[in-house]
Regions:
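Transmembrane beta-strand segments of Gram-negative outer membrane beta-barrel proteins
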Residues: 24-35, 94-98
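Transmembrane beta-strands of outer-membrane beta-barrel pores
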Residues: 33-39, 51-53, 60-66, 83, ...
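Mid-chain, well-packed structural core segment of small domains
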Residues: 93-113
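Residues that define the transmembrane beta-barrel architecture of outer-membrane proteins
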Residues: 27, 39-45, 50-52, 70-77, ...
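Repeated loop/turn-to-beta-strand initiation elements of outer-membrane beta-barrel proteins
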Residues: 28-30, 53-58, 86-94, 122-130, ...
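Outer-membrane beta-barrel "beta-signal"
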Residues: 120, 142-158
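Cleavable N-terminal export/targeting peptides
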Residues: 1-28, 158
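Detector for outer-membrane/organellar transmembrane beta-barrel domains
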Residues: 49-99
Length: 158
């Protein structure tokens, strides 16, 4: 069995298990900054809107060198489901993300991918997340886009 497919399958099982204990959250808007890791070291910025645990995000990665060559500035668009299982302590809550993404031409992955994330919410104000975009072997070019994001989270003003 393909290691990537096995990893994605395990993550989906963990996401489903966490979903049974999930807490619903209010609508939020988030702004984040981060840096790619493993296959590149490029700055990333993102903005997102979450409604009933579904989040739509737009991310922008700077141009620069990657493991597979030079990459132009990259836009990533994603839709994800976020599960916060309620296993946290004193305002520090873990969460998991599973979604799909599209990008404008990465050297590391194909145009359409899965988006996986694991993170920690700090008192519903900040969240720290490790993000992975990958096609799970659908595309030949599947090195993966990995980055760490720090997001400021605020209640939606509407």
């Amino acid at each position: 069995m393909n290691k990537t497919a096995f990893g994605v399958g395990g993550f989906i099982i963990l996401l489903i298990a966490a979903g049974y204990a999930a807490n619903s959250r209010a609508d939020t808007v988030n702004l984040g900054v981060g840096k790619s890791v493993i296959n590149s070291h490029l700055k990333v910025g993102e903005i997102g809107y979450e409604h009933k645990n579904w989040e739509v995000q737009a991310s922008l990665m700077e141009s620069g060198n990657t493991k597979n060559g030079n990459q132009k500035q990259l836009a990533l668009y994603s839709v994800s489901y976020i599960t916060e299982p309620g296993w946290g302590y004193k305002g520090v809550e873990p969460y998991l993300r599973l979604g799909v993404s599209h990008n404008t031409g990465s050297e590391l992955v194909g145009a359409n991918n899965f988006r996986l994330g694991i993170g920690v919410n700090f008192n519903k104000v900040f969240r720290l997340e490790y993000v992975h975009h990958s096609s799970a072997g659908i595309y030949k070019n599947n090195t993966g886009i990995d980055y760490v994001m720090l997001n400021y989270v605020m209640e939606a003003p509407w």
